Amino acid sequence: MEKFDIIILGSGPGGYVTAIRASQLGLKTAIVEKESLGGVCLNWGCIPTKALLKSAQVFEYIKHSEEYGISVENFDKNFDNVVARSRNVAKTMSKGVNFLMKKNKIKVFKGFGKLSENKSIIISNQDGSVNTIMGEKIIIATGARSRELPALKQDGKNIIGYREAMTLKNQPKDIVIVGSGAIGIEFAYFYNSMGTKVTIVEFLDRIVPAEDVDISKELEKNLKKNGIEILTSSEVKKTEINESGNVDVLIKTSSGDTKTINTEIVLSAVGIKTNIENIGLEELGIKTEKDKILIDDFYMTNIKDYYAIGDVVKGQALAHVASAEGILCVEKIAGHDVNPLDYNNIPGCTYCSPEIASVGYTEDQAIKKGYEIKVGKFPFSASGKAQASGKNEGFVKVIFDSKYGEWLGCHMIGDGVTDMIAEAVVGRKLETTGNEILKAVHPHPTMSEAVMEAVAAAYDEVIHL
C-alpha cells in the first residue's frame, strides 16, 4: 500500500493549490480526483464563465461600435463557437494543472475517494478497479455542486444548473434565472447580451443581497436599462413542463399575487450543496453541521489528522478562499507559525457589466457593529478614463471608522473594478488609513483614481466633484 505525508480529496482551487504548497514544503503528496483536474472552478465555474462573459463583452462592443466612431455591418454571434471557446479555455487550464502536478511531483489518482480506517483512502478508479492508499494527514476539499429546491427539480434540459447553462446546444429565446447572487447575475448578463429575454427571480428584497445596498440599486438600474426583468421579494412556487416543451413557472410576487411565466429554460442559481455524501465522514465520526464539516481555526476536524477546506466548511464559497485556507492549513501541518485567516478581508467579485467588487463591511454592517463612520463615494461619470472608455456607469464607495481611520469597507461597481479591489484588500491588510491612501499618488488617467477620489470624498477633500 502506497503511503503519503498528505492526501487531498479533490483538485479544485483548494485541493491543487494545497497540494503544490505541500510539495514545496517537502511533503510527499497525493491528490484524488473523480473528474477533471481543477475542479468546478477551472472546468465549470470561474474560468469558463469568464470566457463566456468575454464573448458577450466583445459582442456588446461591436453592437455599440458607432459610439466609438466605427461602423460594423452584417455581424452576428455564433452561439456554438462562443460555447466551444469557453470549453477550450477550460481544457487548457485543466491541462495546466496537470502540468503543475507533474512539475511538483504530486501523484494524481483518478477516481472516487472514500475515507476509511487508519487514515486510508479507498479509491474507486475510473476503469472500475479499486485500490487503497494511506496518508499521515488527509485534507478534504471535495467542493460543492448546484443546490436544488423542491420547486426547481433540475432535469438537465429545461430546468438546469450552472453546468448545463454553460453548454447549451441552442441559445434559448428566453430564460428565467432563479437567484441573483454572482452565478445568477453573470448568466443574466451573458444571455441578455446574446439576445435572450432574461427574467431574474430573487426571494429577498433586492438583487445581489450580500452587497452594499447602493451597489444593488445601481446594478438593478443598469440591468433594467438593458432589458432584463427583475422580480424581487418573489418566489418560484412551481415549475411544470407544458405541451409545447417549455416551462410554466408559477411565481408568487412581491404584491402577494401569482404570475406564470412561460419560458424555454429555467436556471436554478440558488446556491450550492457540499459534496460530503458517501465519502466516509459518518464512519470515522467526523462532525458536520448544516451541510458543512466542522473545523478549528486551522481546518482540523474533530478527528486528529483529518482536515477540511473550501466549500465543505463554513465561510465564503470562493475559489480564492479555498486556496488561502489550503495554504494556511498545510503550512500549519508543516510546523510553520501561522495566523488564522481574516475572513473580513476577503474580496468578492461579480463579473457582469458593470462589474462588482467589494471587501469588508457594508455601510449597514458597519453601523450595526457600532462604528461611527465616514463614507465617501466617487462616480465613474466624473472619471476621465471612464468617459474616454465609454464606460462611465457606477462608482467607488469607501467606509472608514471616524475615530481611528480604519478602512472598514470598499464597494465598487463599474468597468474593470474586479481588477481594482486588490488595492483595498492590501490597504486593509496593512491597516492603512484614509490619509495614507490620499498621500499615495495614483496614476492618471486610470479607473483606480476613483478609489483615491472616494477616500478624498470621505475626508471632505474630493477634487473632481
Describe each PLM feature range.
Residues 1-12, 171-181:
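Beta1/beta-strand and adjacent pyrophosphate-binding region of the FAD-binding site
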Residues 2-4, 20-27, 32-171, 199, ...:
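Glycine-rich flavin
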Residues 7-14, 18-35, 47, 51-58, ...:
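Flexible, glycine-rich terminal cap/loop adjacent to redox cofactors
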Residues 7-9, 113, 132-143, 178, ...:
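Short hydrophobic core segments
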Residues 14, 38, 183:
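Hydrophobic/small residue at the entry helix of a nucleotide-binding pocket
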Residues 46, 142-197, 201, 229-230, ...:
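Glycine-rich dinucleotide-binding loop and its adjacent helix/turn
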Residues 110, 295-298, 363, 401-402:
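Short, acidic, Ser/Thr-enriched surface-loop or helix-capping motifs
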Residues 156-171, 260-335:
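FAD-site-proximal beta/loop scaffold in flavoenzymes
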